């Protein structure tokens, strides 16, 4: 009887040691495929090992919420499904102006080759020809100081400002487009019949994959950024008696 009891206790202890602790490794509210999370966890383990050997000051800064110069595995950036033409990791600031047509072209699945040629083509063939106007005026810029954002589940997450890849510091940029003015003309949107319609310009959003922090863990998440300026219409009430 004592031998059977000892065997059961031993099996129970082995089972506890062999049980995977996945809940402590996976960020809450995130659904990463297991293969991808394994690679991400490997890079985090590497970063933690380096952090333990670093001075106490930088470690305390990271724990306090700093999201700069976090070491990540370069293999994470080879996943094609994680790429977005509106998200850029670069060691230097990108050009001030960018071609939104190129961004849409790349989203559709075309290979981003010969970008210089497309830029020249766009500059020689403007979007609006003589006599053509935009209903709403928009402005597009590369944003490199984003610290927080809203994820696809409505939760506010911390955005990684910089990452360390192969001992080089890359900054995370987001190409955002928003309305320059909600009312480009006194009546609202340009070219709309104000006698029958109310109108105004508003910024719309989309979700892109970005590197974020959740607690002490880095992970890819869909975050919301500004991507377009559109005209909103509503029919005016009839004045019939």
From Swiss-Prot:
One of its GO terms (molecular function) is growth factor activity. The keyword Disulfide bond applies. Residues 1-18 form the signal peptide. Disulfide bonds join 136-201, 179-229, 189-231. GO terms for cellular component: axon; dendrite; extracellular space; synaptic vesicle. Homodimer. The homodimer interacts with a single NTRK1 chain. The homodimer interacts with a single NGFR chain. The NGF dimer interacts with a single SORCS2 chain (via extracellular domain). The NGF precursor (proNGF) binds to a receptor complex formed by SORT1 and NGFR, which leads to NGF endocytosis. Both mature NGF and the immature NGF precursor (proNGF) interact with SORCS2 and with the heterodimer formed by SORCS2 and NGFR (via extracellular domains). The NGF precursor (proNGF) has much higher affinity for SORCS2 than mature NGF. The gene is NGF. It is found in: Secreted; Endosome lumen. Glycans are attached at residues 69, 114, 166. Residues 19-121 form a propeptide. This is Beta-nerve growth factor. It comes from Saimiri boliviensis boliviensis (Bolivian squirrel monkey). Keywords: Cleavage on pair of basic residues, Disulfide bond, Endosome, Glycoprotein, Growth factor, Metalloenzyme inhibitor, Metalloprotease inhibitor, Protease inhibitor, Secreted, Signal. InterPro entries: Cystine-knot_cytokine, Nerve_growth_factor-like, Nerve_growth_factor-rel, Nerve_growth_factor_bsu, Nerve_growth_factor_bsu_mml, Nerve_growth_factor_CS. Nerve growth factor is important for the development and maintenance of the sympathetic and sensory nervous systems. Extracellular ligand for the NTRK1 and NGFR receptors, activates cellular signaling cascades through those receptor tyrosine kinase to regulate neuronal proliferation, differentiation and survival. Inhibits metalloproteinase dependent proteolysis of platelet glycoprotein VI. SMART domains: NGF (SM00140). It holds the Pfam family NGF. Belongs to the NGF-beta family.
